[in-house]
């Protein structure tokens, strides 16, 4: 069994124009403390993560004609993976799922209950080794329950390099 913790921080970077509703950048900080659990049973591995996104106030959200401070309530996130490891050749596959809830926004102190995010996705991942420290990873996911946004399918391919050795 492995227990872990992490803290993800997103700084207000990129180009932000308060006169536009949609921007390339963000005008607030975001923090996500997260706790994780991993347990192996032979060739099977179960991973689970729970975290909460916290956001600072955007004091210049779409400020036409005057600046409007926007706040967002925390967003809880849960993620899980059930993986099958093929040790002989370091190949693995997994069933992946996640769930988010929260994020009600307020503009000028007025809460918008319609902005609450509640969504989940399910998918799979396949990883094949290329060399001792490199692998190719392919994944697919689909929205399973979408209340607000996020109703899309994803397909991804990634090259992964690991500087660490394989756990025993």
Residue spans of the language-model regions?
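Outer-membrane pore/translocation modules
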Residues: 1-71, 114
């Amino acid at each position: 069994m492995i227990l872990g913790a992490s803290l993800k921080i997103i700084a207000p970077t990129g180009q932000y124009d308060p006169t536009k509703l949609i921007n390339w950048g963000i005008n607030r900080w975001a923090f996500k403390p997260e706790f994780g659990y991993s347990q192996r049973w032979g060739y099977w591995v179960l991973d689970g993560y729970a975290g909460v996104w916290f956001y600072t106030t955007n004091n210049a959200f779409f400020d036409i004609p005057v600046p409007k401070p926007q706040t967002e309530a925390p967003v809880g996130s849960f993620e899980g993976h059930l993986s099958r490891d093929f040790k002989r050749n370091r190949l693995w596959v997994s069933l992946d799922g996640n769930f988010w809830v929260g994020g009600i926004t307020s503009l000028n102190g007025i809460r918008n209950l319609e902005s609450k995010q509640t969504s989940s996705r399910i998918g799979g991942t396949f990883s094949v080794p290329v060399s001792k420290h490199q692998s190719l990873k392919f994944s697919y996911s689909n929205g399973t329950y979408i209340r607000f946004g996020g109703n899309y399918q994803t397909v991804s391919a990634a090259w992964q390099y690991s500087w660490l050795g394989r756990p025993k």
